[in-house]
Amino acid sequence: MNAIATEADVLRIENQGPPADLPASTYEMIGRGAAIDPTAPALSFFLRADDHRKPSRWTYSELMRDITRTANMFSRLGIDRHSVVAYVLPNLPQTHFVIWGGEAAGIVCAINPLLEGPAIASLLKAAHAKVLVTLAPFPGTDIWSKIQPILSQVPSLQSLVLIDLAERVQGWRRMAARVMGRRECKRLHGRAGLRGAVPRHIAIHDFDAAMARESGDALLASRRFEADDISSYFCTGGTTGLPKIAIRRHGNEVANAWSVGQVVGAGMGPGKTVFCGLPLFHVNAVLATGLVPFSRGAHVVLGTPQGYRGDGVVKRFWEIVEQHRINFFSAVPTLYSALLDVPVDGWNIDSLEYGLCGAAPMPVEVFRTFQDRTGVRILEGYGLTEGACVSSVNPPGGERRLGSIGLRIPGQMMKAVILDDAGRYVRDCVENEVGVLTISGPNVFAGYLQEDQNKSLWLDLDNGRQWLNTGDLARRDAQGYFWLTGRRKELIIRGGHNIDPATIEEPLHRHPAVQIAAAIGRPDVHAGELPVAYVQLKAGATATETELDTFIRGLIGERAALPKRIHIVEAMPLTAVGKIFKPELKRRETLDALIAALNDAGIEGARVSMADDPSYGLALHVALSDRAQIAKTHTVMGRFPFAFSTSVEPEHQ
């Protein structure tokens, strides 16, 4: 089957429709991929970049065996279709067993291991997790130190399943690693060990031992899968950083994997190899470099527990590509930018056909330079947790339009619409008109677990379908390509001007010293917001704020979009998948703007703190040293669109 080339191919596939026997579950879908050739390599893993030439490997029959064993283990622990298995894990082979075995037995909840303990506890409680799978104590890892103190805070938790990282160490070093793990446990918990560190009502299990006791031939539970069965909870952050738990069904994930398979065609199937470096708590890693290749009989190479963040992975990436004959990988723009600093010369990377880019818009200069230097074709796409994973992508077999997020995937509708001020549908956008991007189809999730987070989520377009309001702004051209023009919540609104951050970011990326750039709005009493930019320079490069300001002035056509300030920072705040975390930059500017406004009003020594609030978004508190300053503080703070409170610090009275 050829890869998609044009919108006509999308329509042709839709006219044919999905197969009548489309799997009802992800377990069945992987099983069909395994049946193509049970002896073919399915999954390879290396613990360190230095060991990538001698990975651990699973054939498809072994992969299905271990997924089935894991599902049966969870069933024996009391998991059914209505109960939740949560995991807080790095990228390991067992992580895949937990994901797909967990979905076969019940509902899987993916939690970011980089979160702090209290945030993890909140998600576990919200999900009503019955079983938690995480790492056992091991030197150099901090997951257990986050998990152990919060176990007593999760009343629904009945079983703790621990994965010993020492078992992934190869050769003679494994015995030494086991000793190190035991010493770490003793250092943390003394003679009482793990049992003394875990509440008595929570049973403790060793993952490998418990799994090995189960049969891998068939599922023990006589479960009849339905496409509407809930398969997973994935946690997704809003612009304020507040977590939302997205409810996804087997049918959502199966539909998306099937659609993406139609897009790539023979580009992902038997004999093809996919590299996974994004974290397995994120939908991109789980579907684009997990379920999709597994469902089509391709080989997945899982590189280190930290993925792209692993020591030496980026530095040796082209070597890894050559050794494993990688055909496809998925990454975020910051990773492509980092790879530009790694010489390609001397490595044979002719196997590498495509690199998928999502999570954030790809800077034009990075896109051009990467393709010119490596010859690798970048498929820029668009997706979101709420749409399972992929919603649109540039066609592998057709024109890849620089800056576009491509054609919609088969089976999922996608359009730009005009909404009124109340968020109600007015009409569809005409060709190349910017509007709110909406999607509808079998891949679209069921909603958020917390009901009040579903407000304004769905749109009624008077056509009998349910449409998801993505919150992004986009246009559709005459050939069906979509173009993101910004995110409504990220737009910088200066007076009457709506400024797309890309208007500032793209010119900054053209400067030879700039590695990555981000533009945000700084609160301003008079203009509402003023544009400011943050820049991280390339290693060894130099540039001043004045130099960058002069450079971009001739490249930004809209005077209102000229940034009032350019900050050069050592390291840009990033999310766990490498996406620039703009909320952190927004917080910095907000805090600085408010303190400056208070100082200008003669209110000195005030301390401003901020917190996420489920009702107000960002809630501020001003601690004063003088009670006489309260009235003036209310006047100053009232000029900004934030909820706030004040107090007088007793020690400063």
Residue ranges and their predicted role:
Residues 303, 354-358, 362-381, 385-482, ...:
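Conserved AMP-binding/adenylate-forming
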Residues 86-88, 95, 99, 103-138, ...:
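Short beta-strand->loop structural element characteristic of the AMP-binding/adenylate-forming
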Residues 103, 254-276, 283-327, 342:
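Conserved AMP-binding/adenylation subdomain of ANL enzymes
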Residues 134-148, 165-169, 305-307, 322-369, ...:
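Adenylate-forming
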Residues 74-79, 213-228, 233-278:
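Conserved adenylate-forming
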Residues 107-207, 644-652:
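Structural core segment of the AMP-binding/adenylate-forming
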Residues 115-125, 130-137, 322, 329, ...:
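AMP-binding/adenylate-forming catalytic core of the ANL superfamily
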Residues 22, 39, 43-92, 96-99, ...:
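Conserved AMP-binding/adenylate-forming core of the ANL superfamily
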